[in-house]
């Protein structure tokens, strides 16, 4: 499948059209960003690692009955995906307290959350992705009640599948974000799942193995990503 025109360039991925109007090429770049894109650096191998990591995770989720946009790997940094009508809201599942939740509520980082929390955020970098709720989504037309219910259902199902996957690999799935879109009217998981959009801690040491290593200037970003990939069985080379 040949990529044609650039359709959209995000903070770490570029989307291209193809000769099939229902399919796109998603290219993972080496860019890494923080502070809503205000801080950007390049890291060798990152695009390749995230592409193969994402393909591996999406395959696992498909096997669990979660519809995804994934079609097939095209290269080390490119994947063929369905063209979705994206819903402009991020779904976040939280199994442990971290990030904005800790700042917002003043609770201890790492606090176990049972049952896991489900949050919604409007995708808007200029507004720093404000937290919203289902009422906002329905009033402003971002998603219908049925779509929201399906997004929530699929997010919790993904959490069940991935929490076990990472737990078996000696890792804690602290939290993660998912984005959904519509394909022929069906709610489908889009975008990506990688250490860029999730928090993963080592079970024994609680070392951070995700993009917090970049956000908090801890170093060893790609080494951590590759270690996580290796533990869960992603073939990188």
Curated annotation (Swiss-Prot):
Under InterPro entries, the record lists: SAICAR_synt/ADE2_N (IPR028923), SAICAR_synt_PurC (IPR033934), SAICAR_synth (IPR001636), SAICAR_synthetase (IPR050089), SAICAR_synthetase_CS (IPR018236)
Annotated keywords: ATP-binding, Ligase, Nucleotide-binding, Purine biosynthesis
Q: Which GO terms describe its biological process?
A: 'de novo' IMP biosynthetic process; cobalamin biosynthetic process
CDD domains reported in the protein's UniProt record: SAICAR_synt_PurC (cd01415)
Its name, as the record gives it, is Phosphoribosylaminoimidazole-succinocarboxamide synthase
PANTHER family given in the database record: MULTIFUNCTIONAL PROTEIN ADE2, SI:DKEY-6E2.2
Q: In which pathway does it act?
A: Purine metabolism; IMP biosynthesis via de novo pathway; 5-amino-1-(5-phospho-D-ribosyl)imidazole-4-carboxamide from 5-amino-1-(5-phospho-D-ribosyl)imidazole-4-carboxylate: step 1/2
- Enzyme Commission code(s) on record: 6.3.2.6
Q: Which HAMAP family match?
A: SAICAR_synth (MF_00137)
Q: Which Gene3D superfamilies does this chain map to?
A: ATP-grasp fold, B domain (3.30.470.20), Phosphorylase Kinase, domain 1 (3.30.200.20)
Q: Which GO terms describe its cellular component?
A: cytosol
Pfam families for the chain: SAICAR_synt
- Entry similarity comment: Belongs to the SAICAR synthetase family.
Database matches in PROSITE patterns: SAICAR_SYNTHETASE_1, SAICAR_SYNTHETASE_2
**Which Gene Ontology molecular function entries are recorded, alphabetically?**
ATP binding; phosphoribosylaminoimidazolesuccinocarboxamide synthase activity
Q: Does the keyword Nucleotide-binding apply?
A: yes
Q: Tell me what reaction this enzyme catalyses.
A: 5-amino-1-(5-phospho-D-ribosyl)imidazole-4-carboxylate + L-aspartate + ATP = (2S)-2-[5-amino-1-(5-phospho-beta-D-ribosyl)imidazole-4-carboxamido]succinate + ADP + phosphate + 2 H(+)
Decide whether keyword ATP-binding is in the record.
Answer: yes
Enzyme class, top EC level, equals ligase
């Amino acid at each position: 499948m040949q990529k044609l025109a650039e359709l959209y360039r995000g903070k770490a991925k570029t989307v291209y059209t193809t000769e099939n109007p229902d399919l796109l090429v998603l290219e993972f770049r080496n860019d890494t960003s923080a502070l809503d894109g205000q801080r950007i650096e390049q890291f060798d191998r990152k695009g390749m690692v995230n592409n193969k990591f994402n393909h591996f995770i999406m395959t696992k989720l498909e096997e669990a009955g979660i519809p995804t946009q994934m079609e097939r790997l095209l290269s080390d940094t490119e994947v063929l995906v369905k063209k979705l009508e994206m819903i402009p809201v991020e779904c976040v599942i939280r199994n442990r307290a971290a990030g904005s939740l800790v700042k917002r509520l003043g609770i201890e980082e790492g606090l176990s959350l049972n049952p896991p929390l489900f949050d919604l955020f409007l995708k808007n970098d200029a507004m720093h992705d404000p937290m919203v709720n289902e009422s906002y989504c329905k009033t402003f037309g971002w998603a219908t009640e049925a779509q929201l219910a399906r997004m929530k259902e699929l997010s919790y199902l993904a959490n069940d599948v991935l929490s076990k996957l990472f737990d078996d690999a000696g890792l804690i799935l602290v939290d993660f974000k998912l984005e959904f879109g519509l394909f022929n009217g069906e709610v489908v998981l889009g975008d990506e799942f990688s250490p860029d959009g999730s928090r993963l801690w080592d079970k024994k040491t609680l070392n951070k193995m995700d993009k917090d290593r970049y956000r908090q200037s801890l170093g060893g970003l790609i080494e951590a990503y590759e270690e996580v990939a290796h533990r869960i069985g992603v073939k990188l080379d």
